[in-house]
Amino acid sequence: MVSLLCCGPKLAACGIVLSVWGVIMLVLLGVFFNVHSAVLIEDVPFTEADMFEDPNPPAKMYRLYEQVSYNCFIAAAIYIVLGGFSFCQVRLNKRKEYMVR
């Protein structure tokens, strides 16, 4: 029978911890970008043309903030998937301990 086990117990536990931290961090960043936090303006990909040549500069900046927040939420979802994979690996490692060879 083919085993889906590809990680050891320590690597799987590390994957869970990193996934939980990544989800928390990225969701908080996504929320802060979504409310247009001024502290995070350095991380918004805008050019001088977006600020000075655009007839409605705040709308363009708000769209850029929201795009970055969506990217953070997508990355958090990917971390959730990887955390689920790590959790499955932990369960498979536990089951392997009880199997008789």
From Swiss-Prot:
Chief subcellular location equals membrane
Entry similarity comment: Belongs to the RNase K family.
Localization: Membrane
Q: Which keywords belong to this entry? A: Endonuclease, Hydrolase, Membrane, Nuclease, Transmembrane, Transmembrane helix
Q: Which domain of life is it from?
A: Eukaryota
The function of this protein is: Endoribonuclease which preferentially cleaves ApU and ApG phosphodiester bonds.
**Could you tell me what this protein is called?**
Ribonuclease kappa-B
The record ties this protein, via InterPro entries, to:
Ribonucl_Kappa, RNase_K
Enzyme Commission numbers on file? 3.1.-.-
Annotated PANTHER family: RIBONUCLEASE KAPPA
Q: Does the keyword Transmembrane apply?
A: yes
- The portions of this protein that span the membrane are 13-33, 68-88
Instruction: Please report the record's description of how this protein sits within the membrane.
Output: Multi-pass membrane protein
